[in-house]
Every structure is written in structure tokens, then in C-alpha cells.
Design a protein with these regions (language model features):
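Histidine-centered catalytic micro-motifs
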Residues: 2-12, 130-138
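Active-site gating loops and adjacent loop-to-helix segments of metal-dependent hydrolytic enzymes
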Residues: 12-46, 144-149, 174, 222-229
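Hydrophobic beta-strand scaffold residues
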Residues: 64, 90, 131, 174-175, ...
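C-terminal cap of metal-dependent C-N hydrolases
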Residues: 257-294
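Non-catalytic positions within long, well-ordered alpha-helices that form the structural scaffold/packing
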Residues: 51, 55-58, 100, 147, ...
């Protein structure tokens, strides 16, 4: 089953809001449209909307998702409530406070341009938890400061320069790319092939406000955008995300959790395929799902 390696599902209350706005106008803290809408919504509304998104992820074969969770400690608790009783496992990276990190599985930083984050990084390391940070989304200026924090992974990396690619390789820092989101926000698209040559690369769907949390759609877009094999894209959507978070899923091996997505190879869409992996990555969709075992 899939591992969605970067999400913001809190803005499930505002799907397709903000058409035509820039990245900063959409999501920059504290007053981007997303943050305004989150403040205006009740806790009940946000929990209900997040649960609908998690149910959609379950239907489309996602076993776990790495969530950068707004709202401090309360935001962490709200997401856990939204996921209660469902088969999908949220891996929550708290934001805004050290206390949110302590309540979650780690800390998700907005980006080095928004703050220094050394205190949060130190506290996260002391807790033995995961630290991720956005970098290189708008431009390259925040990549070196992000790498200086020794993060466990970076998100986006749309604008790496040769020096940054060398540092990624030297430090073996994984990267999560979200190409559909980057296209929607008009910041460019990540150099997926260059990144994949140098480090572990995973796929995420980013904000539900901007894109459905469908790994089928993300795989298809990435595969048709980048000069990488279908096998590599499938790993990006499964094993590599699990590896970043230390999850016991994303690959079928003896001793691992049996979290499986079963597709109907005789569906109208998949009947007659000549390359199964290529078809799963570039063609399959929710209509081809026969079963999800989580």
C-alpha cells in the first residue's frame, strides 16, 4: 500500500479555495488564506473534514501519511481523533511549538525563511523523533539554512543548485517531492531525476486544499513529468516514504506488516496491459481498486 510522504490535511475544509493566489497568499503563516480559514472553522468542522480525507486515502490504498500538523498540541489531538477507527495510520509532525512535537511523532518546520528552528531541532533530536522542513519551494535561498539544521528529510526542493545537490548526496538527506502542488502554486517543478540520482526520494500530495490526496494521481504526474522509471516512481510512493518515517510497511517482505493494495488486473482500464508496473504508476486509479488490506 502507499505511503503519502507529505500532507497538510487540515485545509480539507477549503478544497479548491484561493484560485489564482500566489503560494504566500495561499499558505504562508500566519495570514495566508489557509491559516485564515483554519482559524475561522470550528474544531468539529476541521475534524470532520480531515476524517473525510483520511477515508479517501484509505479507499485509494494509502496505509500511512506524514502530516505537517498545524494548530500546536490541539492540532495533533484533532488529527488523532479524525483518524480514530480507520485503517490509515497518520504519522504526525507537530508544528509551531516544542510541546506539539512532544505530543506527536516529530516536528514539521515551515521553512528556514520563516524562523531559525534550532531550538525545535535540538528538542526533536533529544526526543529521538523525526524532523522535517520545507526547503527550496519558492527559490534556493532557504536550502542551505535548512540543511544546516541536519534535518531527517526535506520537502519540495524545486530549486536546488549544484551545491545543494552535492550537499544532499554528502549528507544523505532524503527529499519528499510534491510536483502537482508545485505546479498549482506556480513555483516550478522539482528536478526529480537529479534528486533521485543523489538521495532517497519520496512522493507527497501536500495540501488537500490544492490537490486530492491520491497517490495514483501523484505517481502518474511524476512519471510523466520526470525521466525516471516506473519502478522508481512506485518506490517513491511506497517504500521510500515508509523508510523516511521508519514505518513497517511500504514493501512486501517477511516479517513486515501486511498492508496491501489489490488492483483488478481485468478492469476495463487495466485489461490488456503489457507492463504491469508501468500501468500501476501511469494508468491505474481508484476505479481499479479491488481491495485494501490495512
Amino acid at each position: 500500500a502507499f505511503v503519502n510522504a507529505h500532507t497538510h490535511i487540515g485545509d480539507s475544509i477549503a478544497k479548491e479555495a484561493g484560485g489564482g493566489l500566489s503560494l504566500d497568499e495561499l499558505v504562508a503563516p500566519p495570514d495566508g488564506l489557509k491559516h485564515q480559514l483554519l482559524r475561522a472553522a470550528s474544531r468539529e468542522e476541521k475534524v470532520r473534514a480531515m476524517r473525510r480525507s483520511i477515508q479517501f486515502m484509505e479507499t485509494t490504498g494509502t496505509a500511512s501519511f506524514l502530516e505537517f500538523r498545524e494548530g500546536g498540541v490541539e492540532g495533533v489531538y484533532a488529527l488523532r481523533e479524525a483518524a480514530e477507527g480507520l485503517g490509515v495510520e497518520p504519522f504526525i509532525l507537530g508544528r509551531e511549538t516544542v510541546e506539539a512535537m512532544e505530543a506527536a511523532e516529530g516536528f514539521g518546520a515551515s521553512g528556514a525563511r520563516d524562523g531559525e528552528f534550532s531550538r525545535e531541532r535540538t528538542a526533536t533530536a533529544e526526543e529521538g523523533k523525526l524532523f522535517g522542513i520545507h526547503a527550496g519551494e519558492r527559490d534556493s535561498s532557504d536550502i542551505n539554512p535548512a540543511l544546516d539544521l541536519d534535518p531527517d528529510f526535506l520537502v519540495h526542493m524545486v530549486h536546488p543548485e549544484p551545491l545543494h545537490l552535492d550537499r544532499l548526496a554528502d549528507k544523505a538527506v532524503p527529499v519528499v517531492v510534491c510536483p502537482r502542488s508545485n505546479l498549482v502554486t506556480n513555483v516550478g517543478v522539482p528536478p526529480i531525476a537529479d534528486l533521485a540520482e543523489r538521495t532517497t526520494l519520496a512522493l507527497g500530495t501536500d495540501n488537500v486544499m490544492l490537490n486530492s490526496p491520491s497517490m495514483f494521481r501523484e505517481m502518474e504526474f511524476a512519471a510523466k513529468l520526470a525521466d525516471v522509471s516506473a519502478h522508481e516512481v512506485l518506490r517513491m510512493a511506497t517504500y521510500n516514504g515508509a523508510r523516511i518515517a521508519g514505518l513497517d510497511c511500504g514493501v512486501i517482505e517477511e516479517g513486515r506488516a501486511g498492508k496491501l493494495l489489490v488492483l483488478d488486473g481485468d478492469s476495463d482500464n487495466l485489461a490488456g496491459v503489457q507492463d504491469v508496473v508501468r500501468a500501476v504508476v501511469r494508468r491505474a486509479g481508484v476505479g481499479d481498486v479491488a481491495d485494501v488490506i490495512l
